[in-house]
Regions:
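Flexible, low-complexity charged segments
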Residues: 1-98
């Protein structure tokens, strides 16, 4: 089952200019885990917003940066819904802008 977590607009950590990340995230999980993800959506969204604001444009540029963020999101979600887990995290939108 794929569960959308919605749109995110996050101020990135930049010293000189305001930069934002606009992204949409969905997660894939077993059908039996879907209700746990939905029940914890506010906590999951808060965690994603808080730790992603520490990223810089440079750290998110390129495939490796996006994969690192995706892996970190999956780890954080799985910590929140433990002992359940999500199998995959999908970016359905990923835009860095001013």
């Amino acid at each position: 089952t794929v569960v959308p977590l919605g749109d995110f607009i996050i101020n990135l950590k930049e010293s000189s200019t305001l930069r934002i990340l606009q992204m949409s995230i969905s997660v894939e999980c077993e059908t039996s885990v879907e209700s746990k993800v939905v029940d914890k959506t506010a906590e999951i969204r808060n965690a994603i917003l808080m730790f992603t604001s520490e990223y810089t444009v440079e750290s998110l540029t390129g495939l490796e940066g996006k994969m690192d963020l995706r892996d970190e999101i999956q780890l954080r979600i799985n910590a929140i819904i433990k002992p359940h887990r999500v199998e995959r995290v999908y970016f359905t939108k990923f835009i860095i802008g001013k």
